[in-house]
Amino acid sequence: MIPGEILFADEPVAFNEGREAVRLTVLNTADRPVQVGSHYHFAEANPGLEFDRAAAHGRRLDIAAGTAVRFEPGIPVDVRLIPLAGARVVVGLRGATGGALDA
């Protein structure tokens, strides 16, 4: 491999395969765009986003790691959310959870 070289797979790479997903419609009620990253606890996303936060508890966007979804003002967007994996502990962010998701 050469430094900086990009090697492509012969077949599409599946990610988050087999994870239980829920679909939600999100409306940005703010006056400017809001972006949410791939591994952000979606229930704690910007308060200008209107959606079922209880259904989003313990979940993140079903998108590739390191990417994000941009929500433009006044435009509803359907998203898929999957469970956060690993230890399922959320600290920081907006402070709504502050620990174990399954406690």
Curated annotation (Swiss-Prot):
Enzyme class: hydrolase
Similarity section: Belongs to the urease beta subunit family.
Catalysed reactions, as listed in the record: urea + 2 H2O + H(+) = hydrogencarbonate + 2 NH4(+)
Pfam families attached to this UniProt entry: Urease_beta (PF00699)
GO cellular component: urease complex
Superkingdom per UniProt: Bacteria
Gene3D superfamilies: Urease, beta subunit
Protein name: Urease subunit beta
GO molecular function: urease activity
EC number: 3.5.1.5
Record localization: Cytoplasm
Gene that produces this protein: ureB
UniProt keyword annotations, A-Z: Cytoplasm, Hydrolase
Organism for this UniProt entry: Streptomyces coelicolor (strain ATCC BAA-471 / A3(2) / M145)
CDD domains xrefs: Urease_beta (cd00407)
Assembly: Heterotrimer of UreA (gamma), UreB (beta) and UreC (alpha) subunits. Three heterotrimers associate to form the active enzyme.
InterPro entries: Urease_beta-like, Urease_betasu_sf, Urease_subunit
Biological process, per Gene Ontology: urea catabolic process
Functional pathway: Nitrogen metabolism; urea degradation; CO(2) and NH(3) from urea (urease route): step 1/1
